[in-house]
Amino acid sequence: MIVTMKAMEKRNKKLWTLYLAMALITPCLSLRQLYATVYAGVPVWEDATPVLFCASDANLTSTEKHNIWASQACVPTDPTPYEYPLHNVTDDFNIWKNYMVEQMQEDIISLWDQSLKPCVQMTFLCVQMECTNIAGTTNENLMKKCEFNVTTVIKDKKEKKQALFYVSDLMELNETSSTNKTNSKMYTLTNCNSTTITQACPKVSFEPIPIHYCAPAGYAIFKCNSTEFNGTGTCRNITVVTCTHGIRPTVSTQLILNGTLSKGKIRMMAKDILEGGKNIIVTLNSTLNMTCERPQIDIQEMRIGPMAWYSMGIGGTAGNSSRAAYCKYNATDWGKILKQTAERYLELVNNTGSINMTFNHSSGGDLEVTHLHFNCHGEFFYCNTAKMFNYTFSCNGTTCSVSNVSQGNNGTLPCKLRQVVRSWIRGQSGLYAPPIKGNLTCMSNITGMILQMDNTWNSSNNNVTFRPIGGDMKDIWRTELFNYKVVRVKPFSVAPTRIARPVISTRTHREKRAVGLGMLFLGVLSAAGSTMGAAATTLAVQTHTLLKGIVQQQDNLLRAIQAQQQLLRLSXWGIRQLRARLLALETLLQNQQLLSLWGCKGKLVCYTSVKWNRTWIGNESIWDTLTWQEWDRQISNISSTIYEEIQKAQVQQEQNEKKLLELDEWASIWNWLDITKWLWYIKIAIIIVGALVGVRVIMIVLNIVKNIRQGYQPLSLQIPNHHQEEAGTPGRTGGGGGEEGRPRWIPSPQGFLPLLYTDLRTIILWTYHLLSNLASGIQKVISYLRLGLWILGQKIINVCRICAAVTQYWLQELQNSATSLLDTLAVAVANWTDGIIAGIQRIGTGIRNIPRRIRQGLERSLL
């Protein structure tokens, strides 16, 4: 057996060498060349800051300022908005660096500038006014009756006027009164020395309507739908939308009115929620109704020269104490809201100890910051919120209870009214808001608040105080835009495939498809979470579906721009819409130009002849493991190099096509008869004749060499020719020997055509013999190869048989050894088992005989 194994080992050494060589060669054979392929409309994006445009359902017949502004500045909303979920996609959001907030701030400033459009310069009121108190007015809205002189149409003539002013709108002068009236002092309007005061007109209803912000073509808006998302960080539940939800541009301080509620728990947003002195934006998960009223008043129109000025009527105001404005709310529900806010904050900071959470009034500042400031139908309210923020909660962990309850179910906020207001837009005074006739009522929903902590959070501190704050309107817009971000959809990407573009192509069969690559952004992104291979199969269908929606969007933009041009009101929003449209067109043209330079115009998948460099990352495994977004991040540093190589290859392709088109001139037979071509034809003929002569010489040399190697001497080129003897010549015998009529070989000249025929015939025969020999040689090689493969197969079969025999032999040996071991073990066990059994039997017999032995002993003793 040992001899057999050694023989087998010796025989298989060569086979092991062959197997090792095949194992090394096989991976090399499997590495196929990859080529760069351009894919259009892939789900790849990057953060961007384009110009957004707005959409709204404005009522064209309404005179309300928001409607007028929206009808002129915004396009109609989409009746069937698209929202595509992005599965398996995560992205980072940061509301504190979101440019959408900045743009909305600019837009709302534009809205207010138009809604409170100044039309009358009020510089004539910046004069000394003699004012007296009015009995019956409340402390919150103290009023004075003032007399002042104004210039009439005739400049050198003065006229005395009377008007009512709120004390908060007046500034006392040190001048003494020229009259002897009691309680009379000299006043002027506030801030007359710092700015020009203008009157807002006309004063009508001021009810904000929802405005949707939309991304232009080629861009998309990501929306985070996670209920626990607070505006900063990574979101894992993302959808793609064309426009945001409807946002009501309600301007207020301290409280957020008519906003969007939090879907889950109360949301608290801040740059650092632990730091004191920083704004904390609170979004509630339930609303609290607040109703604000201003009683009936009369107004009077005063003609000052060619201008009209409106003020409160003097006749119906004196003695009327019901002029106080106020806001009502449910104090019990408000206390619950503050309690939930405190508990939510403690939950976010992971509080575990006991602490007192206090809500206190504003610490001071401008009237717009220390009071709840908002606009109600054109009147500017300044409401004292000290009662709303007068709560203390005793908390243990994240559970709080009310320590002081000083209010009933109904809460009332006293409010001031001002005619000369400080504009929140640019932080200056100078807007005179004329009083509105009649009774004013505004019903709002409290959906949030803006707070500040007195001190930085410290778990060892037992007291935390929150105060309301306001003034930065961007915080209000952040509550609406915290879960949005704008991205630019990259029109194309590049990836390696095994398919290469033909090196030369006349492009006669290129498909003419007008694909707007710069406009593919919604449905394409819906496949963002899929792998590259899965996403590439659905691009064509989504592209066709989405292109129609983008075309409609562009048409709506164009209609809005045309309407503004007809109304001669191409304002900043009209310019913004025009920029959005031009941006889309410029993006489209730029993308189409790049695709044209690469030879990919009109193609969704464009194969190129650029070989994928092994130094570039990526192989065929990326199609099943990576998404397009992940792949784009990996090649971001080398994509420009790849595109340059594609452009160079396309330039070479164009040059090759030019040469190919030049050869296409052979298709016209008339070009053959051109006199300028004749010299070229003669040149070709000379080349052909020279080639034939050269081949003839080579054949002669080869034949001579062959004959010399076979032992023959070279003969002159002769042809047989039968020579007829002249008549009358007697025949002779014997002298020359042989037959007299035998033909003789003598040289004979030939013509050009017979010689050409002979040469061609000889060349063809020689080529035929050469190819025949080559075919026979190939046949022999194939037969040898087949024989070798057959022998190799036989050897492999023999090796398998030997392996099977060896395996069978060893199995049999193992079986025999196991059987022998079991037999030996059985014999050994049997030997010592028999002794044990015999011993046990003896012991048992002895025990069994004990009674008998006892009986026998007793019998003997009795005998």
Curated annotation (Swiss-Prot):
Q: Any transmembrane segments, and where?
A: 685-705
**Coiled-coil annotated residue ranges, if any:** 633-667
Q: Which InterPro entries match?
A: Gp120_core_sf, Gp160, GP41-like, HIV1_Gp120
Chain positions covered by the region annotation CD4-binding loop? 362-372
| Pfam families found in the cross-reference section | GP120, GP41
One Gene Ontology molecular-function label? structural molecule activity
Record's comment describing the protein's domains: Some of the most genetically diverse regions of the viral genome are present in Env. They are called variable regions 1 through 5 (V1 through V5). Coreceptor usage of gp120 is determined mainly by the primary structure of the third variable region (V3) in the outer domain of gp120. The sequence of V3 determines which coreceptor, CCR5 and/or CXCR4 (corresponding to R5/macrophage, X4/T cell and R5X4/T cell and macrophage tropism), is used to trigger the fusion potential of the Env complex, and hence which cells the virus can infect. Binding to CCR5 involves a region adjacent in addition to V3.
Which protein is depicted?
Envelope glycoprotein gp160
Q: Tell me which species this is from.
A: Human immunodeficiency virus type 1 group O (isolate ANT70)
Output the lineage of the source organism: Viruses, Riboviria, Pararnavirae, Artverviricota, Revtraviricetes
Q: Tell me the gene name.
A: env
